[in-house]
Amino acid sequence: MANTPEDTQNTQNDSQNDSQNDSQKDTSARATSARAHQQPQEQPPSPMRVLRGACAQLAELTGMEAESVSSFERTEDGWTLNVEVLELARVPDTMSLLASYEVELDAHGELSGYRRVRRYERGRSDRS
């Protein structure tokens, strides 16, 4: 059976339509794939979660439980806290030794460093 010019034109149109459909499917598949590879943005930890985590991490490293947090602030790199720790229990309690630790955390709340900045008896106030 011989192809007529009309048959040839229909074949070319079908071929072009198939090519366009394949191109659209490919573009759609790439867009779907790109969305699948995007990671959902993590929410930063809440200040309370950071505070509790910092106290727990400091206790794990020093073996001493935090008594209180005297300062807590967000920095460019994460967080900075001052944590009061009971270092030596004495009787009476006013003679117990406390220490103030400066604790640095990254933006995710992971401890990146700490140092003792002050040691004092519980019953003594700061001198001005």
Swiss-Prot record:
The keyword ATP-binding does not apply. A minor component of the gas vesicle. May play a role in transcription and/or RNA stability and in GV assembly. Gas vesicles are hollow, gas filled proteinaceous nanostructures found in some microorganisms. It is not clear what function gas vesicles perform in soil bacteria. Keywords: Gas vesicle. One of its GO terms (biological process) is gas vesicle organization. Its main location: other. Belongs to the gas vesicle GvpO family. Residues 7-22 have a biased composition (Low complexity). It is found in: Gas vesicle. This is Gas vesicle protein O. Pfam families: GvpO. One of its GO terms (cellular component) is gas vesicle. Residues 1-49 are annotated as: Disordered. Induction: Gas vesicle production is induced by growth conditions that promote production of secondary metabolites tiancimycin A and B. InterPro entries: Gas-vesicle_GvpO. This strain probably produces some gas vesicles from the probable gvpO-gvpA-gvpF-gvpG-gvpJ-gvpL-gvpS-gvpK operon; it can be induced to produce more under certain growth conditions. Residues 29-41 have a biased composition (Polar residues).
